Amino acid sequence: MRTIAIVGKPNVGKSSLFNRILMRRKSIVDDQPGVTRDRIYDIGNWLTRSFMLIDTGGIISSKDTYQDNINEQVLFAINEANTIIFLVSAKDGINNDDKKIAKMLKEKAKDKKIILVINKIESEKYYLNEGELYSFGFGKFFKISAEHGIGMGDLLDELVKDMPIQNNLEKQERFKFCIIGRPNVGKSSLTNTILGEQRVIVNAEAGSTRDSIDNDFNYYNKKYTIIDTAGIRRKGKIVESVEKYAVLRTKKAIERSQLILLVLDGSEPFKEQDEVVGGLAYNANIPTIIIVNKWDNIINKNSHTMEMVKKQIRSQFKYLSWAPIVFVSALDNKRIHTIFEAIEFVREQAMRKIATSLLNDVVIKANAFQEPPPFKGGRISISYIVQVQSQIPTFVLKCNNPKFLHFSYARYIENEIRKAFGFDSVPITLYWQDKNKKLRGE
């Protein structure tokens, strides 16, 4: 699959163009320069052609260390790409930063296709010297408005004209999981260690990752997509509109995932905000693995330390009692393999399908062994059970009247199913339904 990178100075509309090509809002757009910090990846499609699209941070000359990191990210993207969109702004005109980028592209991307694109032509007041644009040496250029969609058809035709027809099946086959946690627990360090490269900027500043970033990779011939998300702060600390959108992005990333890695900082006491983020995982009702990061930073460990930490987690995160706990040190690349062992273990459980006859044997026997208590003037009686979904194991239990069900008895039946069929590391869902109400398809 061909790769296209969008580069340019800050605030020329790179993220707006990225979103316009994808036809949805993937990158955060804001008038504040420097909003895009890492490389953002997604698959675009045009005229039955598929391509990988990369949004990058704005390049400027600066002595700031963080800006140096952004510039380095852009160079990574240029190296990965087959085609470069060099974006400038008609509204702001050409300046020295644009000229420096053009020079850099001639040096760093001389063997790649470079397309000069002039954005923001919707502005009533703009002036561009076409002779100056041709002096860049990139030949033909395109005038567009990413915000309003003007000129996009011609640009997209140019981007895909030499591309083979390709579908999106590879993306669909990948097992997708996201990394969540409060700021500064090491989510981006963990992503980088897993990917084996500096794809996400790691910075000691809490909240340095604002976008959710999709990264495709293979691990021992298995295909995965990992989503690194913005750290979720307490509501009182979210003051920027960009930060608010990043929190929404994290929740959307959870919705797109098949599994969650909840990262905790093992080098300090767990905080209330860790529990809040854990609540998002619980509410999502999808498989979750708790990752205790920075394990090597804990001093004076002994043979009992790990078990003590597990007990503390079980106490503070009672609602995730089924979630496996894994201990790693992302910066030192230690015990990372245990994450994938846990992922595959949980994945197998989540996909497990139980025969209806076996389910009924277990549940009917459990119902007979422990008689349900009377509740709301009646006593529940289970007729039969059937599994209606895997991935998140889901069961429908037919009974005489669901209103007679006491929560303690529902928990008893859930535990019996978990124990009998080995669902000890995934969430399961039970729906209690009146036996006279038919399931869809019956």
Curated annotation (Swiss-Prot):
Purpose: GTPase that plays an essential role in the late steps of ribosome biogenesis.
Query: What Pfam families does UniProt report for this protein, alphabetically?
Result: KH_dom-like, MMR_HSR1
User: In the UniProt record, what gene is named as encoding this protein?
Assistant: der
> InterPro entries under this entry?
G_ENGA (IPR031166), GTP-bd (IPR006073), GTPase_Der (IPR016484), KH_dom-like (IPR032859), KH_dom-like_a/b (IPR015946), P-loop_NTPase (IPR027417), Small_GTP-bd (IPR005225)
Q: Does the keyword GTP-binding apply?
A: yes
Name the UniProt record assigns to this protein: GTPase Der
Q: Which residues form the signal peptide?
A: none
Ranges where the KH-like domain occurs: 352-436
